[in-house]
Amino acid sequence: MANLEESFPRGGTRKIHKPEKAFQQSVEQDNLFDISTEEGSTKRKKSQKGPAKTKKLKIEKRESSKSAREKFEILSVESLCEGMRILGCVKEVNELELVISLPNGLQGFVQVTEICDAYTKKLNEQVTQEQPLKDLLHLPELFSPGMLVRCVVSSLGITDRGKKSVKLSLNPKNVNRVLSAEALKPGMLLTGTVSSLEDHGYLVDIGVDGTRAFLPLLKAQEYIRQKNKGAKLKVGQYLNCIVEKVKGNGGVVSLSVGHSEVSTAIATEQQSWNLNNLLPGLVVKAQVQKVTPFGLTLNFLTFFTGVVDFMHLDPKKAGTYFSNQAVRACILCVHPRTRVVHLSLRPIFLQPGRPLTRLSCQNLGAVLDDVPVQGFFKKAGATFRLKDGVLAYARLSHLSDSKNVFNPEAFKPGNTHKCRIIDYSQMDELALLSLRTSIIEAQYLRYHDIEPGAVVKGTVLTIKSYGMLVKVGEQMRGLVPPMHLADILMKNPEKKYHIGDEVKCRVLLCDPEAKKLMMTLKKTLIESKLPVITCYADAKPGLQTHGFIIRVKDYGCIVKFYNNVQGLVPKHELSTEYIPDPERVFYTGQVVKVVVLNCEPSKERMLLSFKLSSDPEPKKEPAGHSQKKGKAINIGQLVDVKVLEKTKDGLEVAVLPHNIRAFLPTSHLSDHVANGPLLHHWLQAGDILHRVLCLSQSEGRVLLCRKPALVSTVEGGQDPKNFSEIHPGMLLIGFVKSIKDYGVFIQFPSGLSGLAPKAIMSDKFVTSTSDHFVEGQTVAAKVTNVDEEKQRMLLSLRLSDCGLGDLAITSLLLLNQCLEELQGVRSLMSNRDSVLIQTLAEMTPGMFLDLVVQEVLEDGSVVFSGGPVPDLVLKASRYHRAGQEVESGQKKKVVILNVDLLKLEVHVSLHQDLVNRKARKLRKGSEHQAIVQHLEKSFAIASLVETGHLAAFSLTSHLNDTFRFDSEKLQVGQGVSLTLKTTEPGVTGLLLAVEGPAAKRTMRPTQKDSETVDEDEEVDPALTVGTIKKHTLSIGDMVTGTVKSIKPTHVVVTLEDGIIGCIHASHILDDVPEGTSPTTKLKVGKTVTARVIGGRDMKTFKYLPISHPRFVRTIPELSVRPSELEDGHTALNTHSVSPMEKIKQYQAGQTVTCFLKKYNVVKKWLEVEIAPDIRGRIPLLLTSLSFKVLKHPDKKFRVGQALRATVVGPDSSKTLLCLSLTGPHKLEEGEVAMGRVVKVTPNEGLTVSFPFGKIGTVSIFHMSDSYSETPLEDFVPQKVVRCYILSTADNVLTLSLRSSRTNPETKSKVEDPEINSIQDIKEGQLLRGYVGSIQPHGVFFRLGPSVVGLARYSHVSQHSPSKKALYNKHLPEGKLLTARVLRLNHQKNLVELSFLPGDTGKPDVLSASLEGQLTKQEERKTEAEERDQKGEKKNQKRNEKKNQKGQEEVEMPSKEKQQPQKPQAQKRGGRECRESGSEQERVSKKPKKAGLSEEDDSLVDVYYREGKEEAEETNVLPKEKQTKPAEAPRLQLSSGFAWNVGLDSLTPALPPLAESSDSEEDEKPHQATIKKSKKERELEKQKAEKELSRIEEALMDPGRQPESADDFDRLVLSSPNSSILWLQYMAFHLQATEIEKARAVAERALKTISFREEQEKLNVWVALLNLENMYGSQESLTKVFERAVQYNEPLKVFLHLADIYAKSEKFQEAGELYNRMLKRFRQEKAVWIKYGAFLLRRSQAAASHRVLQRALECLPSKEHVDVIAKFAQLEFQLGDAERAKAIFENTLSTYPKRTDVWSVYIDMTIKHGSQKDVRDIFERVIHLSLAPKRMKFFFKRYLDYEKQHGTEKDVQAVKAKALEYVEAKSSVLED
């Protein structure tokens, strides 16, 4: 009874006085209508008491407003209290505690002992046993970031650092303590933890005394499978549960954790919730009670009121909330003291059990300048708007460094501040900021920011025995161990360091996850200038650095660096002198300087030395040096040289500045073998070369080298100067000096040399050393063996031994170097006098040229002329001819692939993918499929499949990687996988890329003949299997054969001797009815007689006549037309006519019969065949005038279907016919045609494209017969439109989309007539149009496509703004208005117009919002005039009183509430103004007087909608009893009023504005209006409700189709788990060819759809697979597939991908996938059956039979019958019916009582067999010895069959047999 009273307080609302009010709040907390009641009572008091009580009422109203504002105060640590229940989100999971994100940017902590009692008990057991328990999970295994949890505040305290700390508990005993056993009801959503595992389920601790909660195993299976990865639930596991059954008055409850039940759980009145036991996380249905600047007030569960602060509004709906709006909300918390219920409208909280998404932390710690304030909240903090539009929040404590200097005035909206992002709140999805100077200037904000080895400053906090604690940031502390307090060990560190001292430290180790920071104060380490080692990869041989000794052993010292990197100094490397006992010389903690000898990062091993090598001595000059001392050149010296002359082998040069002669061999000009001869060719006498290396001097001859690799080696000091420095394992850079049969000799820059034996020259088998290397080639060599006595060394050149680091980086460096050298050659060429050479130097790959075909060579390549200069050789290889028919003199557009700078040839391509390159933004590091287009010796050029961009990639990834077997060599046309390293072509014209694994290469199909298969041609495999036998058939021969397979457009026939023949669909019937499929007339296995009419060439699959010399090696083309089978038929073609000639014979307008081959989704056309060698295309727009057909052409057209088409003409290649199904394609005036939108131009109209390249334009005046505010809103690129052609002048189509034009039969009402000239206008006429522009003398107003009128300012508005610029703001271009024609001047072609309300009958075009822009003087003047005219003395007195106190009032429940929010109303857009204007027109038909602005009514509309107006104050509003705001009637708005006070325009708690008096005076005209009668108000109320209902029904109409991305966003927001909506959204983008957006939608869907909705997610995965298969690369498809397998049941994903491959006719890929499936899922019968069906569809019956045998071997015996029956069924449908019968018969002979098999056998025979066969089976089955129930089933089927197909006699016969069976059974029973 107590609960009942609590939920339903007795009695009505009553007036309360000040003393009672406080009492009521503390005692009768459940009456949540206190705010509304106060307002209502205040209003009644006002009307009853009159002016005498005004002052008292205003005080009460002000306190009420303050109380309302306090309810919206967001949570702070101070407002929390112990026992408060609150919804939280797991932010971090540590070993011993959880960090919980709470609403409004708060944070709390849950100790490991606060999970549940059972878990704590297990922990105690583990501690007692001192051994880990197997069934006890750690916190990271029980909780994951993002989980929503219900918490209770257990304590509020202060940490050691002086910070406020919130301790929370998840223990159900504490969270659900407010529930009693009697209060439990079915459907309640509770949280609990698993307390124990039972035989049939789990006991769950829900924390309710006297209640035992049980979760049946069956109900937990779905959760275990989806959430627990199949593992059983463990003690302590947190669950969201639904109460399913309640027994024994709550003593026992049965729970469910199913996803569907939990995610849709709603708290209802039937569950008897009250304020004491409302739990956070409950989802409730609510109704908006009030819309305020601080948030929303909601009614829910009938009697409760809650608040939604600005942080928890739905971001996508903010600004659209209105009173009485129905919403769903989630309870965040109920404050135990104030009893305020905090709610959230964020969609992610409205699905219980769904985890929150983790926010990106990439900007965490960023310092931001000039961040504008969005709003300020007194007791909470301030909101800010970041540059990317994201909302951010700073708590009050973070707005200044101290409370003393805090100034609230600095946080007015618009003020800017410098701040830093310190955290992200997952619960609020916003960034948390700090304005504290100490935090902004802090060197580090979090542990993640600190790198090992960094020098940091800190403050000493304390000194303990374990070390010194140092504060290095606001929330970070580090430890300095005792060993690191100084360079030497300190006994009394407290004497040197004191608490508060600032110290400089160097970071030794930082572990952000464990929040562990170790530092050192050793001076030598801190001040060291040597490089630091933070990982083993940093340790390069020869590197000198500082470290510290951590252990001294007898075998040496272990030295440690940073980040736990350490190495060993062996005993012999401790000193140059022998040290017998290291422990006496060295000590732990000693700082030492070491040099790295060797490092193996993979094994984390490092060898160090204390013996530091001194600088090498300078090289002595050779004894016989002939140069003077002052002019000596040292070996290894870098010099500049001048070319003197060229020789055969190199360049004679002079070393500058002393002109010492030297020789530079050709092979030493570059590291790239191919570039040496190129540089040698273009260098000439006088050229200067820089940075040339002196290699050797002998007999006065200086040998030079210009190889960059060798130059870098010498500069870096990595070249050993003498043999003593050589040791095994060293990696050196040198060049091939000579090549022998037994190996190659390698020389190094210093003159040292070694032998690389044949055995270790390469990882590949070496047959000939000269195949692998050439003299002078740059190589990397690893020393394997050293003979110090003979000073010889053995080297390895194997790639596995000579790794130079990351292969991708090396590959890119080699490519960069090669291209830079080529660019240098171009520079040399540009200095030549020849115009040809200069032109070649300027040409780069990717450039486009318009050329003329000069000659087609025998090899199929094409030579072009017409280049930029004469004599320029431009060639396209046969491959780059792209199968095009070219003739001399033809003009072609080509793209340059490469310029051969040695042969002076330009390689070009005709490939359309390259010529029509797509402009798409590329990402660095992205992977792409590419096709090799050109090969050079060092690099290859490939084109990206998606865009056609040209990219270069190196053919080698190592200096030694020069040998390739033939099978490894790339070929032109081959597919490769590339990773882009640049996104812009640069000076080379090429993108730079690195090739992926060789396994991703794909081979191109070989085409040995110049006649190539059409790019869209798909060859029947039946015509390509095996070798085509030579035959002796000739024209006119009659042959007999058996139908082998049937395809949509042809039938394959097997003739005698295994010869394969083909019958085209056009040669089956003489008269083909439209819509039929002729090939279906023939059945597989049927014997046919045909006549030979031609043949198909096996190489090109092109049709050949009999007379062709290659006819004997062709597939005979046959005909079974009755007319051609007649004797004496001689009309056969015996001479050769090419398809191009045949196509010329077709005339435009001619009607032909064609056969649909397929619908090309990508290119949007139907591919058809007219004859075996004549193909055609029908653009989608020419298939129908019906939008339904164009939207789903696959439903209208079937493959193989015969179509009647009209010839349009040959296409551009002259090899195909263009056809139309809509009659002759003539774009002439008066015609109606279908087009596709290609561009939408704001305020102008559309650009529409038609088939075959025609373009037209549609003006905004021709979009519809009725103009609209947003005429272009429904149009997006790629949308299909029905157009009427107005004119075709100047080859530009002028179009109209008006229904009266495109569908005149509908007799569409023309609201806005067409205005094409001034002749169409009459004086006095009312016309609508669009604002054109604002000019000094008036407003130009567009009345038609070419007609513009002028409205002078005196005829624009009754208002006269002081600034004319305000017209631009309030009359934007394109705004729809109504105007009256005042005067026409036909001579000057001038139309004068008026917008005034008196002329148009419409509201003033300058809305109330403009009034706010006028100066205060103008407002006062206008108001004074109104007061004089109307003489409202009473109103004047009232306004004077209000003006005196206006400054004190913040918000009033009646009219006074408008005052502080007036500026907000002024800021609203034109849309609200227009709505209010149209509203006034409906409600009050009297025209306004000039002095009355629309702002008054606008404000009335707004604030009445917010429940803050009195009905008696305006004639617009009806009079009604004020019960509660939810019952206030709505105005008749044309569309739902949008509350525009969203996150962008929140009014914070600022001092009230000074316009109160003005606001009050604005309302006077309303107070003076005549009151309406009660009947009028009731009628008006009914109209308003009907109008609102109509709008709501329209918005809720499930049949309403989305037409924009915003529509789809709304839909998926309302139904986030509906895959159908997501797929429609993807299809919407695909129709607009927005592939990336479609991908993004799919990825968004996968993130949004709940993981419990497995099927919905799978649907999206399948759609994404389809998308990648159709528009992506094989690599992108594979990646998506691998992800899909990871997140779904693998078998389903495999089967879906196989179907996708099969449907897209990628049969090879499908076959390979099926074989993978057979290995992985051999026990799944579905895989075998699907593979069998696939093979049968491909006419591979024999392979299908083998699959059946394999299936029977792999599958268990119990599955055999089902599999055999299914294969037999497939044989019936797709293969040989006779074989199917045999399989069924064999199966039924073994299993005669398998009635399911009998039933399938009967079904198949009915479909594919004869009536005799069916009756035979029925006769057999009704004589079987089966159960009577089964027999009844078969008798019934037999009877139904005879009724449908038999005679009355047959029916009676079946009945007689049934009766006979019944009698026989009865007699047996009687016996």
From Swiss-Prot:
Residues 1416-1459, 1469-1484, 1575-1586 have a biased composition (Basic and acidic residues). It comes from the Eukaryota. One of its GO terms (biological process) is rRNA processing. The gene is PDCD11. The lineage of its organism: Eukaryota, Metazoa, Chordata, Craniata, Vertebrata. GO terms for molecular function: NF-kappaB binding; RNA binding. Keywords: Acetylation, Isopeptide bond, Nucleus, Phosphoprotein, Repeat, rRNA processing, Ubl conjugation. There is a cross-link at residue 1416 (Glycyl lysine isopeptide (Lys-Gly) (interchain with G-Cter in SUMO2)). GO terms for cellular component: cytosol; nucleolus; nucleoplasm; nucleus; small-subunit processome. Gene3D superfamilies: Nucleic acid-binding proteins, Tetratricopeptide repeat domain. This is Protein RRP5 homolog.
